């Protein structure tokens, strides 16, 4: 059974801090577009996502045949694994669990590069030494989930070069990239055509609060690999509502700009309050905060109607590590009030 954030079904929580979607909510234009798509539910979706493909290629300034769509980023991860069929997969740890879930489908052996707490769980240059010819595939979440740490472009290029030298396929998960203060400084999007062994993973889920619509995509300049991915993907995996919603979302530039402005301000506020309450707070760069507290904090919050993400099931983490998303100020004030109540007994 998968264990992720957002486990609200069958429970009654008044505030869900366990999922990292944009707290500003789904844009109204996206909701209306999805509704128009739902009205066409008697039809099969466009298997090639033509309108969405054209809009996204223009938005990212890339070629249309460099995009593969999926039913969320997780769907693209599984398709990439099935297409490459790696025998050995390397990931930093802790990181997003879905990479390992997908690797199990092809019975790949997992290798982990354990990130050190004394280094704030940052990926260091020692990772390059692990990129040897016996590794077939690498997944790199940037910024990382759950730690929020981000790898800068110079280091990403060094990793991509080493992977290219040793025949390793590199998947860089940039699903949280838009939440960084300078997204381009932490992205390989501009280097897509330089590396045939590179795929960038992105989704509409987090930035546009579209988790329930399921729309993710992979970007890659290797045409043969993209064709293989298409063979490994189920047809009609992207619904009409999701395709319509994606086209509408790409027009919401003002919504994204305002969201990022709010999230950065509230992230500073929340980090400061967590530190004031005595928690060990790490340098998370995205729309969530990674921190250390008493192992029973999730239970204590749950008893007060608030769900937070217990990270103890992540490889490389012991009990006592948690992740919370950044929400609107009124909600963040309530979280702080509850945490203060717990701390003060």
Language-model features, listed with the residues they occupy:
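Phosphate-binding glycine-rich loop
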Residues: 49-89
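Active-site phosphate-binding strand-loop segment of PLP-dependent enzymes
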Residues: 111, 117-182
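PLP-dependent enzyme catalytic core of the Aspartate aminotransferase-like
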Residues: 303-304, 313-345
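PLP-dependent aminotransferase class I/II
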Residues: 25-30, 197-282
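N-terminal "arm"/small-domain region of PLP-dependent enzymes with the aminotransferase-like
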Residues: 1-43
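Conserved PLP-binding catalytic core of the aspartate aminotransferase-like
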Residues: 272-305
């Amino acid at each position: 059974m998968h264990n992720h954030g957002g486990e609200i079904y069958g429970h009654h929580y008044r505030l869900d801090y366990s999922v990292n979607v944009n707290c500003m909510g789904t844009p109204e234009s996206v909701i209306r577009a999805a509704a128009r798509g739902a009205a066409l539910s008697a039809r099969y979706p466009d298997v090639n996502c033509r309108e969405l493909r054209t809009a996204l290629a223009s938005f990212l300034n890339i070629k249309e045949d460099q995009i593969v769509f999926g039913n969320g980023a997780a769907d693209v991860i599984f398709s990439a694994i099935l297409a490459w069929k790696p025998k050995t997969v390397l990931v930093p740890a802790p990181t997003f669990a879905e990479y390992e879930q997908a690797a199990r489908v092809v019975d790949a052996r997992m290798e982990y590069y354990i990130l050190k707490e004394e280094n704030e769980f940052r990926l260091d240059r020692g990772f390059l030494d692990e990129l040897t010819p016996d590794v077939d595939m690498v997944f790199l979440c940037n910024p990382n989930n759950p730690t929020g740490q981000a790898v800068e472009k110079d280091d990403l290029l060094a990793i991509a070069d080493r992977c290219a030298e040793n025949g390793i396929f590199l998947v860089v998960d940039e699903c949280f990239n838009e939440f960084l203060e300078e997204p381009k400084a932490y992205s390989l999007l501009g280097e897509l055509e330089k590396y045939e062994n590179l795929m960038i993973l992105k989704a509409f889920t987090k930035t546009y609060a579209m988790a329930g619509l399921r729309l993710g995509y992979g970007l890659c300049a290797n045409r043969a690999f993209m064709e293989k991915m298409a063979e490994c993907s189920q047809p009609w995996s992207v619904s009409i509502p999701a395709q319509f919603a994606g086209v509408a979302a790409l027009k919401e530039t003002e919504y994204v700009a305002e969201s990022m402005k709010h999230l950065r301000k509230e992230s500073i506020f929340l980090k400061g309050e967590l530190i004031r309450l005595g928690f060990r707070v790490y340098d998370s760069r995205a729309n969530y905060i990674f921190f250390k507290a008493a192992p029973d904090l999730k239970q204590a919050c749950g008893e007060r109607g608030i769900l937070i993400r217990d990270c103890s099931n992540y490889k490389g983490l012991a009990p006592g590590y948690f992740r919370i998303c950044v929400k609107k100020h009124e909600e963040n004030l309530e979280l702080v009030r509850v945490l203060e109540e717990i701390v003060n007994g």
